[in-house]
Amino acid sequence: QYFTMVEENFQFKRSEMHQIEGFPSEDVNSSGQGGLLDIKRHPNYINNGWIYTCFSKKNDSSDMSTLALARFQLNEYNIADIEIIFETSSLSTRDGHFGSRISFDSEYLYLSIGEGSPSIGGPTTPYDNAQNLNNEWGKIHRIYDDGTTPQSNPIFNENSPTSLFSIGHRNPQGLTYNPYLNEIALKYNKNLNK
């Protein structure tokens, strides 16, 4: 039995406290609210060995970032088979509101992404990323565990990313799946945000 932890400087470690090598920390933009944002084991980790992480990813030409979701496996104390399976198509020009949590249900992977503050176009851009159906910012995305998109996802408009599942999120810092919550009503004091 092992557990994986991440230190502030993006060093992965296992329960025996050995350093894990191989994560491309030079690709992580850790300014502001950026950095390594979440890490989750696949629900079937015991059989497939996949670990998922999301992070603000540096851009080659500037200090702007995309939001990336990667998966990898561990080979003793080395990261193996790392691959980016999802990445925003546009850059955030601010270093905040990345959001970013990972959750699984029995079939899909869900990824929350913050609206990135007043990004895309700079600080004078209106705060509309969460409502903008043509980008990935400020949304919950539903994908398969290999990064492909289910055909059953909602279609918001013809230019919307196919991964969109829910829109209008400012900076989601939590995301969980509750298979037993099937009834939402004020009289039962239930809430989707539990």
Predicted regions, residues:
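Beta-propeller blade signature
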Residues: S65-N78, T125-D146
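Acidic/polar, solvent-exposed loop segments in beta-strand-rich repeat domains
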Residues: P118-N135, Q151, K194
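Second-shell loop/turn segments in exported
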Residues: P24-N29, T124-A130, P161-T162
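Acidic, Gly/Ser/Thr-rich repeat motifs that build Ca2+-stabilized beta-propeller blades
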Residues: Q1-I120, G174-K194
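A structural motif
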Residues: S106-I113, W137, I143-Q151
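Extracytoplasmic, non-cytosolic globular domains
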Residues: N135-Y144, S163-L192
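Conserved loop/turn at the beginning of each blade in beta-propeller domains
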Residues: G32-Q33, R94-G96, L133, E158, ...
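Short helix/loop segment immediately N-terminal to the Walker
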Residues: T124, T149-S160
